[in-house]
Structure formats: C-alpha cells, structure tokens
Amino acid sequence: MLKAIILIGGPEKGTRFRPLSLDTPKPLFPIAGKPVIQHHVEACVRIKELKEILILGFYPSSQMQQFVSNMQNLYDVNIRYLQEFTSLGTAGGMYHFRDQIRSGNPSAFFVLNGDVCADFPLPQLYDFHVSKGEKALVSIMGTEATRQQAVHYGCMVLGKNEEVTHYVEKPRSYVSTLINCGVYVCSIELFSRMGTVFHSKQLDYNSLNNGNGKDLGHIQLEQEILTPLAGTGMMFGLPVSKWWSQIKTAGSAIYGNRHYLALYKNTHPERLANAGLKASEHSNGSLVCNIIPDVHIHPTASVHPTATLGPNVSIGPGVVIGPGVRIRESIILENAVIKDHTLVLHSIVGRSSQIGMWARVEGTPSDPDPNKPFAKMENPPLFNNDGRLNPSITILGYSVSVPSEMILLNSIVLPHKELSRSFKNEIIL
C-alpha cells in the first residue's frame, strides 16, 4: 500500500502569484481547466497501489472543502485535507501528522510540492526507489537546468548507483546543474530523521538558543533532512527528461497551461476542443468557432462561431466570447465576458471580468530561452533595477471592467477596477 502527500503551503505564500491568488487559493487556480493540484491528484491515482492522498497546508479548511469533496467523487481514492495550525515548513507538517500518514502501514509515500507542474513520472520514480532496496530513505526526481539558473533551486550531485553524494538548497555558487523537482518517494523510516531534528530543536529552545521566532515544529525538508542525508547512501536521485516547471508567478501559469494542454492529447483527449466539433452547448450545432490546437473550452462556456481560439487557450465555466474575438496563449477564467472583435494575447482574464468591443489586451511571455538547452522559466521580480515594471503577461484581477477600444499592454489590474483609459507597463491599484 502507498500514500501520497501534496504540500500546498498557505495564504502568506504565493504572494508573487497575486492578484490571481487574492480570490482563489494558488493551489486551486485553474490551469488547463483544472485546479493546479488536481493534476497532482490525477498523477497519483494512476498508481494502483496508492490508497490515500493527504493534502497538507494551512489554508482554512473551508477553502479546501469543496475541492476535496469533488476529488472524492471523481476518483476511487481516499482524499483528505489536513490543516496545519501554523506554517510548519516542508517537513514540519508531515511530522506533525505522522500518525495519519503511517496509519494502515504504507510501504512508502510520495511527496509532491503543490507549486510545481509536470508530466509526473510517479510509477518510474517508485520503481527506481524500490530498486535501491531497504537502505533507500528518499528518492528525488531531478531534472537538468542551466548553470546560471541552477543556483535558484536545490542542487544535487550524483555518485555511482545514482546515490546523492551532495545536496545544497539554493547554493550561493555553482554546485550542479541537476536540480530537485520537489517530487519524492520516501520510506516510513524517514520520520525517525524528522524526529531527531524536532528533538534537537526542543533542546535548543530549552537552552534559549531558539532565535528564529518560528514554531518548534517548523522543519524544512530540504535544508534539515535532505542536506544531512547526502553522502550517507540512503538518498538517491532519478534524473528525468520530461517537462517540469515551477509555478511561482502568474506568467508561469500560462507556460504550465500550454504544456498541460499538450499532455491532454495522450491523457485526456476529451478535454480538448477540436476543430470541426461543436465548441459549446450554447453554439449553433452547424457552426463552429475556429480552433487552433490546443484549446480547452468548458461545456458551459458560450463561444461565438466567428471567434478564433488558440493555440494554448483555456476557457473557463460560464465564459461568454463574442463575434470576431481572437484569443491566443491565454487563460480566461469563470464568468468572464469578452465582447466583439477583441484581441487577447498572453494574458489571464480574471473571474467575472468584462472586456469591451475592439479592445486589445496583450502581455509579454516569460518563456524559457529556447536557445539554451535545459533552460527553465525565468521568474523575474515585478520591477527592474531602475524601478520600472518588468514586461510580463497582462493580468486582470477579479471583476475588472475594460471599456471598448482600449489597449492594455504588459499591465496588472487589481480586482474590482473599472478602467477609463488605456494603460502600458503599469500596475493599476
């Protein structure tokens, strides 16, 4: 029997994802028409031996309740949300809920960070872990990055037999181009390691050496568990070449959307809208909107036959798209309205937002450099060294109104704004 743990953090995390995370928890933001962590759940349920999925975080239970209920109805696996009483780090939550994780005596458990998107090769990772025998405490999924980008991730050095001989989280200087993907298979014996760290923190606290102001149970998996395990012969790394990316900024959601839509061709072709088929239940059966693959259209969306969508577009529930609209490389969220002959490129249109006729909403993609092998998504800060806004995708927050014949370029609009003019390279507060 196996279990899986999905780590989702809490409300004070994911601030770079704002304004999209202001009204929707980041783990539940829809990418390719499904919440981010539903893609994790779907990867887990493909493993027959897996009987339970535990979602760990400190979002209020009320925000996760509906999602967990939906997943229970969709999949034949027990799914629960365990709420931490405070931020406990990437390993502290697992140690706090160790009894729930160990119940049923699972042989091992997966750990997936909730802020990554990937073509998760979980069966391959589990087989790799089993092949290393009982000595293996942790097996890490790794991928190649460029030399310059690797220092922004956890870096590991592999010795013979794929053993991790050295591990450093976000090193100051170059260590290795093989980075940690935030996807693990762990043996139950790992909890004894966590217990050792916890008890040493208790001793520090009792001797008044605890000066970080964090809870005693706050344990970082990467720094406090993985780094000491390196070189002990109990931690192994599996390099994979499949697609992987972090979801840190809103721009990475567009990038993730593109790749998940491409994966649907093999995993869920029914989720893709195909040219030549009826685009929505509200459209005339004999007329179809123009679709350039890959596109996901929710069944309740209304798309005019003269609209052109794609490539890499996701249309959410209740969306209304008018005549002559052109949308490319974008995510249109629930109940948004896009009126006649409007152009939307490299943008995310928030829930219940409205864009008038003949408007142009355009952003700048922040894709990996195609000329560099193994390049990952750049997650630049909002502002450059001159204090100017870095060009990025355009984001409309919840219930934003853009009037007709306006241009919105490389801008971020916070919720509930009614724009009265065009904007370029601005944050509209």
Spell out what each predicted region is.
Residues 70-73, 100, 128, 155-161:
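Short, hinge-like loop/turn segments at secondary-structure boundaries
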Residues 106-110, 117, 122-133, 145-150, ...:
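Catalytic-core segments of class I nucleotidyltransferases/pyrophosphorylases
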Residues 294-320, 324:
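C-terminal accessory/binding modules appended to enzymatic or scaffolding proteins
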Residues 9, 323-429:
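Glycine-rich hexapeptide-repeat left-handed beta-helix
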Residues 1-25, 29-124, 390, 398-399, ...:
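Conserved N-terminal catalytic core of the sugar/cofactor nucleotidyltransferase
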